Curated annotation (Swiss-Prot):
Modified residues (Arginine amide): R17
Subcellular location as annotated: Secreted
Disulfide bond positions: C3-C16, C7-C12
Protein name stated in the entry: Tachyplesin-3
Keyword list, A-Z: Amidation, Antibiotic, Antimicrobial, Disulfide bond, Secreted
Function comment: Significantly inhibits the growth of Gram-negative and Gram-positive bacteria.
Tissue expression: Hemocytes.
Amino acid sequence: KWCFRVCYRGICYRKCR
């Protein structure tokens, strides 16, 4: 499983695949 940070329009969150 890979987790990485996603930032969009000033909001960052963690996404895992």
